[in-house]
Amino acid sequence: MDYSHSDSPSTAPAGKTPVDQLRPLLIVGPTGAGKSDLSLEVARRLDQPVEIINGDSMQMYRGMDIGTAKLSRAERAEFPHHLFDCLDVDDTASVAAYRDLAGETVEQIQARGARPIIVGGSMMYLQALVDDWQFPPTDAAVRAKWMAEQDRIGVEALHEVLRSKDPDAADIIEEKDPRRIVRALEVIELTGKPFAASQPPKNVPTRWGTRIFGLKAPGNWLNPRLEARVDRMFAAGLVAEVEGLATAGLSRESTAGKAIGYAQVLSALAGECSMEQAREDTVVGTRRYARRQRSWFRRDPRIHWLDATVADPGLLAGQVIDELRETTQG
């Protein structure tokens, strides 16, 4: 397992960069809102060296390109990109490992005199990074108890148990993600508090003074775009991509195999549904995930919101630059 991958070399500028220009930017929002395009436009308009860090847990996996809408290597060549293609599909992505590796990457970029731009929508991963989450201890016996309960009643029923104990946690954890469901129940039992209570509130200063920009994308605008994007993924070869990755260890039991689109295609390949049903289920799952992302991010008062319906990355990037200038001068 190698989290350290960077797409392109970095060069340190001469002289010392003012501290304010080293503050990371974090671009968040629901899937399909245009975060990656915006990150590139902002990087082009900043009058300083910039390096980009991936904040999408599934884009960390090698070969998972079509179904994650990952920028191509050619698109990533314009600026150094980090934490893309750094895991094999049979590796387990971890919030704690991401916090540590992305944090080290931020500080290495700053040491080179460049500004980090973090871009993605993986909710807990990003908050763990910018708020330096400290994770509660684990207890093997408690975890084993909840895993046994999952085996007894099934993962979807266990998700309902989580909802009864902590509705907010159930809203953000996918109902078919047994590892995170079990972990949340473990934390709740060990601490006697809701899962999120073990983490810092969202109204405290961010780590490194990170500035957060969010793309606001209402469902009536985003949902048709998401369906069209799913259609493009299937047309571009998502099924063949999944078939190839299956030979490299992608399975429904792996973390990568639970990614939206990949899980549905794996079910179809196993004969459990038609490929058309897999496409429809992918659309439904993507829309549900976008709703969870919107719910998570709108609770953070530190986010400066941008209107994704403008659908013009250049115009939105200009708004980001203007906001940075105003707050710096103010």
UniProtKB/Swiss-Prot annotation:
Database matches in Pfam families: IPPT
Gene Ontology annotations of biological process type: tRNA modification
Function of the protein: Catalyzes the transfer of a dimethylallyl group onto the adenine at position 37 in tRNAs that read codons beginning with uridine, leading to the formation of N6-(dimethylallyl)adenosine (i(6)A).
Gene for this chain: miaA
Quaternary organization: Monomer.
HAMAP family: IPP_trans
Disulphide connectivity of cysteines: none
Ranges of biased composition (kind: Polar residues): 1-11
Residues binding substrate, per UniProt: 31-36
SUPFAM superfamilies for this protein: P-loop containing nucleoside triphosphate hydrolases
Region (Disordered): 1-21
Marked site: Interaction with substrate tRNA: 122, 143
Protein name, entry field: tRNA dimethylallyltransferase
Keywords: ATP-binding, Magnesium, Nucleotide-binding, Transferase, tRNA processing
Reactions performed catalytically: adenosine(37) in tRNA + dimethylallyl diphosphate = N(6)-dimethylallyladenosine(37) in tRNA + diphosphate
Known EC number: 2.5.1.75
Region named Interaction with substrate tRNA: 56-59
Gene Ontology molecular function terms on file: ATP binding; tRNA dimethylallyltransferase activity
Family affiliation: Belongs to the IPP transferase family.
NCBIfam families: miaA
The UniProt record lists the keyword Magnesium: yes
Record-linked InterPro entries: Dimethylallyltransferase, IPT, P-loop_NTPase
Binding site for ATP: 29-36
Entry cofactors: Mg(2+)
